[in-house]
Regions:
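Phosphate-coordinating loops and pocket residues in cytosolic domains that bind phosphorylated ligands
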Residues: 42, 185, 194
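Short, solvent-exposed turn/loop segments enriched in Gly/Ser/Thr/Pro and often Arg
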Residues: 6, 148, 196
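Conserved residues at the C-terminal ends of beta-strands
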Residues: 55, 154, 195
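Acidic/polar loop patches that form or flank catalytic/metal-binding clefts of enzymes
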Residues: 78, 191-192
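Carbohydrate-binding/catalytic loop surfaces
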Residues: 197-202
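GST-like domain detector, emphasizing the conserved glutathione-binding G-site
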Residues: 1-133, 139
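GST-like fold's C-terminal all-alpha helical module
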Residues: 96-191
Length: 202
């Protein structure tokens, strides 16, 4: 099994967290969209990373990759057992992809003028902060156990300070701050970090 992974891309990072949490034997080849072999990028009709190759199977959508890994390597499970809980988890992951990731991508790429970037940063902070109440009820992201939803959220939280976005030290946000420190301290998360990603918080 080989994962072609960008060195500091949050989409690649979420897959690396799954690999690390499950202790899956996988060769991680760090590259970029510009330097990845054409035969690898050709697996993905959108010609970008990450790309996961397992024998004759090539996967390019991170949601598909992560659920494939969870089914192929069922221990520890990263999706809830019951259908309703699984559906809720998938809805959360979809929300992150549709509402939070586009804002994060715009800020990372510096899309738009200074005013637009400032607005995107403010909207991103608002979206992230709105999640804080959930961590009063659950130890993890809407779950009692670490799951794929945490794998989606953790890479985003890790990148915020490097983008000039700091969660306020307020009573309302404290559950989220406590949560992120708990996640960042997990051996699986630490093992998932590339050298560039590790430097984001040094």
């Amino acid at each position: 099994m080989i994962l072609y992974s960008d060195k500091d891309d949050h989409y690649s990072h979420r897959v690396r967290i799954v690999l690390a949490e499950k202790d899956i034997a996988c060769e991680i080849r760090e590259t970029s969209n510009d330097d990845a072999p054409e035969e690898v990028l050709s697996i993905n009709p959108y010609h970008n990373l990450p790309v996961l190759i397992d024998r004759d199977l090539g996967l390019y959508n991170t949601s598909v990759m992560m659920e494939y890994l969870d089914e192929r390597f069922p221990h520890p499970p990263l999706l809830p057992v019951y259908p309703v809980a699984r559906a809720n988890s998938r809805s959360l992951m979809l929300r992150i992809n549709r509402e939070i990731c586009p804002l994060l991508n715009n800020v990372i790429l510096g899309k738009g003028n200074a005013k637009k970037i400032k607005e995107d940063k403010e909207n991103l902070l608002h979206e992230i902060s709105s999640l804080a109440p959930t961590f009063k009820e659950y130890p993890f992201f809407m779950n009692d156990e670490f799951s794929l939803t945490d794998c989606y959220l953790a890479p985003i939280l890790w990148r915020l300070p490097s983008l000039g976005i700091n969660l306020p030290l307020t009573k309302n946000i404290k559950p989220l701050l406590d949560y992120q420190e708990k996640i960042f301290d997990r051996p699986g998360f630490q093992d998932s970090l590339s050298i560039i990603e590790r430097d984001l918080r040094d």
